[in-house]
């Protein structure tokens, strides 16, 4: 419980440091208790980011959420599907939220691969490139692999360092926050905020298990193998 409260405090500071609450207030007024809480949390903080004043409020909000990392990006994307919680106008504005974050280093990528696959399998990977795409959960590298003596071009998707631990700590703290909101602001109970956060946790944890994505690609390849014009990347399960 104390750990969750501490994580919630850190998230609150992160939110308070951004422009999220000010931007949200232009769409929907938050409860007074929330405004007071964020005012307290923002004590001694200076704004860490300068947002272009010439862009829309939705673009500003998307940029703020992106700056706060994976958990808030996923939360924003999920809330787009719940206009009953955030309102039609805000849901429409958040459609522009992009699932992008700065890439982590090639050195970190190699360290993760070696730890997960072992030295022998790692040595079968040749010419691992710098990241070619980076999102909130994982990033992609081009590479060549030695598959039983045959050199093949592949793309390797690697989860961000400590992403599962970080996300689950933050989402559990947000679930605690949802519990507080439902307990003290009675009219929010109809929104089932705890269920919303729990569902987001389940969906994102499934997304972080790349075996499901690989299995889906395999199934799609099998279903379209006789269809002209379809080419599905092969999954190398031995890696």
Question: Can you say where each PLM-predicted feature lies in the sequence?
Answer:
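Residue-level signature of catalytic and energy-coupling elements of molecular machines
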Residues: 76, 140, 156, 213
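Conserved ATP-binding/catalytic core of the eukaryotic-like protein kinase fold
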Residues: 152, 162-167
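Glycine-rich ATP phosphate-binding loop
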Residues: 142, 152-159
């Amino acid at each position: 419980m104390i750990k969750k409260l501490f994580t919630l405090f850190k998230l609150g500071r992160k939110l308070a440091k951004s422009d999220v609450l000010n931007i949200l207030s232009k769409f929907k007024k938050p409860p007074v208790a929330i405004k007071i809480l964020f005012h307290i949390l923002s004590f001694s903080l200076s704004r860490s980011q300068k947002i272009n004043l010439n862009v829309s409020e939705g673009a500003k909000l998307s940029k703020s959420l992106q700056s706060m990392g994976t958990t808030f990006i996923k939360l924003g994307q999920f809330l787009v599907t719940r206009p009953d919680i955030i309102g039609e106008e805000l849901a429409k504005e958040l459609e522009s939220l992009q699932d992008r974050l700065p890439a982590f280093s090639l050195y970190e990528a190699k360290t993760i691969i070696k730890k997960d696959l072992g030295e022998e399998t790692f040595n079968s990977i040749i010419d691992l490139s710098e990241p070619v795409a980076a999102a909130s959960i994982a990033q992609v590298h081009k590479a060549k692999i030695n598959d039983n003596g045959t050199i093949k071009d592949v793309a390797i998707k690697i989860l961000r360092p400590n992403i599962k631990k970080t996300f689950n700590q933050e989402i559990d703290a947000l679930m605690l926050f949802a519990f507080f909101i439902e307990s003290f602001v009675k009219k929010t109970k109809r929104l089932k905020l705890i269920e919303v956060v729990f569902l987001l946790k389940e969906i994102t944890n499934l997304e972080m298990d790349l075996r499901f994505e690989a299995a889906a690609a395999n199934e799609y390849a099998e279903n379209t193998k006789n269809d002209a014009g379809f080419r599905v990347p092969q999954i190398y399960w031995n890696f």
